[in-house]
Amino acid sequence: MELSLTLFVTLDGVYQAPGGPEEDPSGGFTQGGWLAPFVDDEFGAFIGAIFGRAEAFLLGRHTYDIFASYWPKITDSDDVVPVKLNALPKFVVSSHLDHADWAGTEILRGDLLTEITAIKQRPGGEVQV
């Protein structure tokens, strides 16, 4: 498998998923949802194409917590994002997460380089970060 990264970032270095203002206010961040005004059909097609290539996901614990609280509840079979997120393997890097209730989740607790190398040696396509 190969690692693939898609990042939403402003010119001044702010990066955050295209969620709403309340998505992640940690550290006093008040600009959540900055991408929302720019989301249109073309953006949706772009995201659909990216998720269409996914064969697994690599998440940090914080992102996992956000995703796991939302995506398992979304069951639109016509939307590639929840279809892929809910069906494919998810690898979560964490030394604190005790268990993962989201189906298909494996917690990576060992040496990160060793764990990622092992994932990359598996057969398959993209592991999206």
Indicate residue ranges for each PLM-predicted region:
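Portal/gating segments that form or line small-molecule/metal binding sites
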Residues: 1-128
